[in-house]
Amino acid sequence: SSNEKNNEIDWLVNPVSEKAMVYKSADNNDIILSNGLLKRTFRIQPNLVCTDFKNMSNGQQLLRAIKPEAEITIDGNSYNIGGLYGQIENGYIRPEWVNKFVAHDSDFHFLSYEVNDLKPFLDRKLNIWPMKQQHPTGKDIAFNFSSSLATLDSIFVTVHYELHDGIPLIVKWVSVKNNSTHVITVGKLVNEQLALVEEESAVVGTPEQMKKQHGIYLETNYAFNNAMRYDISDQTTHWLTDSVYTSQVNYNYQTPCLLKVYPEKVTGVELQPGDIFKSVRTHELLMDSYDRERRGLVIRKMYRAVAPWTMENPIFMHLVSRNDDEVINAINQCSATGYEALILSFGSHCNMEDSSAENIAKWRKLADYAHSKGILIGGYSLFSSRRISDEDDVIDPITGKPDAAAFFGNAPCMGSKWGLAYLATLKAFISKTGFDIFENDGPYPGDVCASTKHPGHKDLYDSQWKQMELQKSLYHWCNEHGVYVNAPDWYFLDGTNKIAIGYREVNFSLPRENQKILNRQNIYDGLWEKTPSMSWGFVPLTRYQGGGPEAVLEPLSEHLKDYKQLMMQYYGAGVQACYRGPRLYDTDSTRKVVSETIAWYKKYREILNADIIHLRRADGRDWDGIMHVNPHGKTKALLMLYNPLKEKITRTIKLPLYYSGITGTALIREQEAAAKSYKLNRGYEVELTFTIAAESYTWFVVE
């Protein structure tokens, strides 16, 4: 807990001065990767293997045994990439054992290595945004391997590590180059395998029942399933048992202590002569705590480092338009209130799949008008959960029928003729109209396809991989062309900007009173691993799916108190909601309320976009609240506090200021009142007393 910690030497509060470096050991036998927060050591002869993986913050050693660097199946045969043999005791490694280990002739052998400065994975133009972003810095090391087997004569494998500055993070991926004159088939490719120290022991227990190693968090850019959470969307992390670890406590050798990373359904991808196959990219983040908030802060720090585009957070309206005049009116309203962007929502009259000259010209003109007012403009398109045709939809491998096993009931195949044309049409529409934002509903959800006639994939065995690559290629293109992407699935590491915070859609048909509390619960629950800018919420200005007048805000001027509070809840959390309807205001008094709220948000934007500390979840019985913290800003913290009760309340709470970076005294003010001085106790807390009117809220600034 923070009680024993000193926030002045905590890398999450004060950045470390050490930079990523790669160096050889004195005896030239080892290559060491280190950045002050983690250290990873490789023995490079007689073959290459990782012998040491250590968290420098708490001294934890993660490895109990050595394993090959990677595994690859080529033309049906499996090969190890690197690897040494001879370890008998697999519960720990003694450094002197490593000198006696031997290589196997049939493995890919280590040839050479290169070290470079880290280059960004996607070349997005940063710093067009009010919040400071930067491309990641660090070192990139490539270990090159080849095989002595005649059949693999011209096949080269490279294992890549990217070590980041200032965060205990290493990214690992593998590339395969086919320098031969014939096609090869790449089957299962395991890009990472680690014999990890077990998290716990049990004499009897299954891998499912036993905890997995907590000192490492893994995230790979191959995730989908509509959960709005990475851990449930993950498709590549496999916690396996290790039968050669004979000294483990578990009687049946069932301890989950062998980690392998690979996409399960990718078993046969053709690699043409001269081409390079690149594996998934696995982010390995070392954890020094069980504390949920701290673990979440580390993950949020990772997104800011590796996917800085997730920090962009334009203030947008979700317009449901029937004609061009409504678009022009909405652009004018955005401009008048300080909004920054307009998205033509689902159900509006913008069809991004209509590539006719007439449609392009119409939207180009509207985009030009938006840009003349300083407003970004975007459109909506649905990929999955729609039916196109028997020829173009995903074919179920079991029944051979279209759509029979689609995740959303129906789905086109991204590799079908229609799917390939869909991608080209979207790019052309965005390029020709000058649209700035793309809202992609139903992004590719992982459906396999058994068709052998689709031009974009060969058969079932490469269908998921090829569709994934096509979906990612669209997001890479958007990212590198500065197009902002909202997509409700986990494609952040491949260039998307925002995902749904995690809500039940029909709740927006409930009375506004329920929506207020449920929205605060969604914010609290949705921001453990995500930063505020990575999520969108929802505010139905007009009827959405169901509900009567008690559920909607129109006429806006008659519901100003609720409209303002719903805005303050989201903007106060740093979360952009989809304000869905035909207009942002109906009267001058409504316009003033919207403008004042946006002006407040822009004034405190830096702290409101900072990570949140969870204070108390909304339960409708007592106060609830969250607090943003930013140790690097002038404003160190900002609290949003709510009273859902029908009477005024006064409460005294302990405010945890550890992650604000404050050490001695905090200056705290309610809204724009005079600040009072508070001395922090040994646990970096202050006692704060506040009063909130019935069914209302307040906010405090900490400096």
Regions found by a protein language model. Give the residues of each.
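Glycine-rich, aromatic-flanked loop segments that form ligand/cofactor-binding clefts
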Residues: 95-117, 121, 125, 285-298, ...
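Active-site-proximal substrate-binding groove within the catalytic cores of carbohydrate-active enzymes
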Residues: 31-36, 53, 470-675, 689-699
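Active-site-adjacent "subsite" loops/lids of carbohydrate-active enzymes
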Residues: 307, 323, 363-368, 376-435, ...
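Conserved, mostly hydrophobic/aromatic
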Residues: 37, 174, 274, 334, ...
